Amino acid sequence: MTEADSLQEISMPESAEGMRFDSALALELGISRSAVEDIFESGDCIWAVDGEEVKKSDRVKVGDKIRVLLRSKESHTVESARLPVIFEDSDIVVVAKAIGYAAHPSPGWSGPTVIGALKESGVQIAHVGSEEREGIVHRLDVGTSGLMVVAKSERAYTSLKDQFRSREVKKIYHALAQGHLDPAVGTIDAPIDRHPKEDHRFAVVASGKPSVTHYEAIEFFPAVTLARIELETGRTHQIRVHFNAIKHPLVGDLVYGADPRLAERLAMKRPWLHAMELDFRHPTTGERVHFSAPYPPDLEESLASLRRSIGG
């Protein structure tokens, strides 16, 4: 173990009970299937109690605690991969964030970041905002794919922060929710704050911050609904919390009540959630600009699997 390696102790969530450890760990850490494979092949996942190796085919039980060694070389390999750039000029860069990337460095996170990947690919980010969050005006969860805009100039940073604060930015997501949404078009208006008992989760709490999510069903499948979602506010985990609150958790979202058997059947290693569209005023021209990003392969394949099951 080097100074750059990170040893993390993880209490497996109750919702992961019965899943294989490789599937559950990919969801919990928000990393790729190949990265999880490397962890188990290297013997870097052990039981917290006795230090014995965890086998990837072992099944999660309630109360399981493990220790996982995340090696710096693995993080560097992922960091060096280019994120698809959708648009770039002197003020902004719009990227399609892959899963497994945090927006910026933070305590306890040793994996790749959007800022790190952009810098390694030669994108010049102005020193705006706090040092570790330079250029970041909004975030996506590690396990969420899709569009992010990053400010390259002070002018862009100020303009975009103001637009997000005043809710001028239009943010459209696609999500696969368990069950059939009824009504098919609706609004979830429920305040969100940290979960009163579990620090890593958020919940609908009466004293929380106002949070509004609009949704519309796009396509119904047996037992699940593909939905288009527009955020009026932008709280941490907002879509995941709101859909869990209405008893329609996102497929693959074990932290917020998803069925692990369905996640495994659709090979979902993370919540089925994608930031599909972004629309905002360009910081220099003042004109509205619109961007979209296609589904990544894991989401495409899960939909294809659902359609094959219908077609027989």
What do the predicted segments below correspond to?
Residues 85, 177, 214-217, 250:
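Conserved hydrophobic positions within beta-strands
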Residues 1-187, 191-196, 297-307:
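RNA pseudouridine synthases
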Residues 66-68, 196-199, 210-212, 258-263:
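Short Pro/Gly-enriched beta-strand edge/turn motifs at strand-loop
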Residues 166, 170, 174, 178, ...:
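Flexible glycine-rich active-site/ligand-binding loops centered on an Asp-His dyad
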